[in-house]
Amino acid sequence: MDGLVAQCSARLLQQEREIKALTAEIDRLKNCGCLEASPSLEQLREENLKLKYRLNILRRSLQEERRKPTKNMININSRLQEVFGCAIRAAYPDLENPPLIVTPSQQPKFGDYQCNSAMGISQMLKAKEQKVSPREIAENITKHLPNNKYIDKVEIAGPGFINVHLRKDFVSEQLTSLLVNGVQLPVLGDKEKVIVDFSSPNIAKEMHVGHLRSTIIGESMSRLFEFAGYDVLRLNHVGDWGTQFGMLIAHLQDKFPDYLTVSPPIGDLQAFYKESKKRFDADEEFKKRAYQCVVLLQSKNPDIMKAWNLICDVSREEFKKIYDALDITLIERGESFYQDRMKDIVKEFEDKGFVQVDDGRKIVFVPGCSVPLTIVKSDGGYTYDTSDLAAIKQRLFEEKANKIIYVVDNGQAIHFQTIFAAAQMIGWYDPKVTLVTHVGFGVVLGEDKKKFKTRSGETVRLMDLLEEGLKRSMDKLKEKERDKVLTEEELKAAQTSVAYGCIKYADLSHNRLNDYIFSFDKMLDDRGNTAAYLLYAFTRIRSIARLANIDEAMLQRAARETKIILDHEKEWKLGRCILRFPEILQKILDDLFLHTLCDYIYELATTFTEFYDSCYCVEKDRQTGKVLKVNMWRMLLCEAVAAVMAKGFDILGIKPVQRM
């Protein structure tokens, strides 16, 4: 319902802009005596009236829906925007698309949220030669606020800021709903299809630190869209085709001549690749055979296909070890999947007159893009450009994707801009209807601020990095003497949770567009915005009820029977922070920057610490340590924090443990 209202509103605004422009043009021409009434203008006016009628019905339906109880968490910011949107439309019905700005307040003295629309509206009125101060506008907006269950009071501050104070009973009810029904977002995706293209290593080469960011960011993004109700297809566009397979297959034939009947023990594929490359560069006869193997591969020769599959399988086994360790889920759909579609792609571009021939190459110039696409090489072979065009068409027409997200490093930005522009040019999709976007990211740097390498200057193998992480996290746990209090099983679980959690969080907590410095020392530090700190904080929160002998059943019963009191300023601050979770996730769904979630989880953990230091959850006898009183509403606040943190961790792909 929300999406339909937004879609209809956007179309209405577009129609109104078109009407305005056409009316001005017609008035100008009429003044010259050139034109009668325009049927095009009348048609637009008629459609606009229909849209306004439909939009009003939708708004009324939405208000009815809002009154019904829901098991999902509420996006409070979004609800306040609806309330202030109604007030602004009622106060200034003649303004076209007035600004609607509602944000959480930065300081308690400014309330819980602020509406800062008055200044922008003042500027719009000034352009219409109406001089009204922002403060007067703010007063007018507040007079037109509809009755609602969210706002306790509003205050006008400074030049025209509207400070919004939420109702305590509303916040308390929302926290109770969260505890009873679990952490559930409003359904946003409505089963729209999202394709996330990420990881994408090359067959016959080991995954290295350069694949880390795409794999981690893509997995987390997929989890977020799934949680928001989208149908997500996670694709691994592996490099499993091309001339390099000719030399690998030729080398396989020489080294394991009976490969068709006996499975070859290739073992170290990286070494195998280097051996074949060395021969390819030094031996002309071998190079010729390698090219012959490429031709046979492209014609799907059965023996060559068997060799190709053997090489791919060895790589897949190596990739799987990393994906299993990091809990990554992917469907492999490599370049080979699109081979049979490429001929038709080239023909379609030729038939529409987009292809030019340059030195035997078939190229496509795309408006607004500096570098043309090469869709056929001078030797008749296809390129990455052809493969990516075939992939985007398959995803749009066969998968019927509503959103396609490519999680690939910043260095590929121009390539993807050109591919997307070419797909629009040929008419495959309309960017107003379908989102096709490149989620770029910076490189991983060493502590010397240069590209992360081994001491010998080689690229860091991803498996080596993960193993080093496991070693470092165990050292850290033993340093804290956790091996003396945890069982062997608990210690192992804590080791993997900290190791992989810290590696993922260190990546995701940085703005993805920036390069980031990889440092085990920093990421394993249990102070500051790190996974180590947050995982420890989570286990501490989970232990509060356990140490007070309160089990899950008691907490569930209390959630239904106990009113959550928010009288202490730290209780109120924590309650509001918990309920901001849906608006944080909505922001990430809009801009695709996951570090916002990390910042929020850290803020939630530090806000909890403030609350816990100021508000007794469990009151004990100082001499005996005996529990005298349990403040159950505060225990419920602890439980709500843990529930939101657990869901945040899940989206980030981090597995917390109960004991650490």
Curated annotation (Swiss-Prot):
Positions of modified residues (N-acetylmethionine): M1
Coiled-coil stretches: none
One Gene Ontology MF term: arginine binding
Reactions mediated catalytically: tRNA(Arg) + L-arginine + ATP = L-arginyl-tRNA(Arg) + AMP + diphosphate
Stretches the record annotates as Could be involved in the assembly of the multisynthetase complex: 1-72
BP GO terms, sorted: arginyl-tRNA aminoacylation
Entry note about domains: The alpha-helical N-terminus (residues 1-72) mediates interaction with AIMP1 and thereby contributes to the assembly of the multisynthetase complex.
Stated role: Forms part of a macromolecular complex that catalyzes the attachment of specific amino acids to cognate tRNAs during protein synthesis. Modulates the secretion of AIMP1 and may be involved in generation of the inflammatory cytokine EMAP2 from AIMP1.
Protein name as catalogued: Arginine--tRNA ligase, cytoplasmic
Organism of this sequence: Mus musculus
Upper taxonomic lineage: Eukaryota, Metazoa, Chordata, Craniata, Vertebrata
Gene: Rars1
